[in-house]
A protein has these predicted regions:
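Sec-dependent signal peptide recognition
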Residues: 2-12
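N-terminal signal peptide c-region/cleavage motif recognized by signal peptidases
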Residues: 16-19
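N-terminal cap/lid segment of alpha/beta-hydrolase-fold proteins
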Residues: 22-47
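Short, surface-exposed "cap/lid" segments of acyl-processing enzymes
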Residues: 45-84
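A fold-wide structural signal in alpha/beta-hydrolase
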Residues: 51, 86-96
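Solvent-exposed loop/turn segments at secondary-structure junctions
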Residues: 58-61, 98-102
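Alpha/beta-hydrolase active-site loop
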Residues: 76-77, 81, 87, 99-111
Length: 111
């Protein structure tokens, strides 16, 4: 293998590894009023260009666990593509229903 081919391969592998690197997600709980918190998943790339707030339709009760998994909504288009938004340099916030609305009917009839 010539030196130029080797260099091209190295550059290609670096580009591939950068493209496959995912922005880690973090679960954040924000106190909103007495005894109530607002949980969200935040994906923050190193230098975000802008921010997007993603909210699932329907009843809105994602039931985000501390590890970032969801009991409902993983199939929702915005929830599925949150990493792609972050990959484009956007800070992403996926918002759950507030802690006092974590059972049926969640946000139905509330918002």
């Amino acid at each position: 293998m010539t030196m130029i081919r080797l260099l091209r391969l190295v550059v290609w592998l670096i580009g591939l590894s950068t493209a496959l690197a995912q922005t880690p997600q973090k679960v954040v709980d924000i106190p909103t009023r007495a005894g109530v918190t607002q949980r969200m998943i935040v994906l923050a790339p190193p230098e975000p260009k802008a921010a997007v707030v993603l909210m699932a339709g329907g009843h809105g009760g994602l039931q985000i666990s501390p590890n970032g998994s969801m009991k409902w909504g993983e199939g929702n288009f915005l929830m599925r593509t949150r990493q792609q938004f972050a990959d484009q340099g956007l800070l992403v916030a996926v918002v759950d229903a507030p802690s006092d609305r974590q059972t049926l009917p969640f946000l139905n009839g509330f918002r």
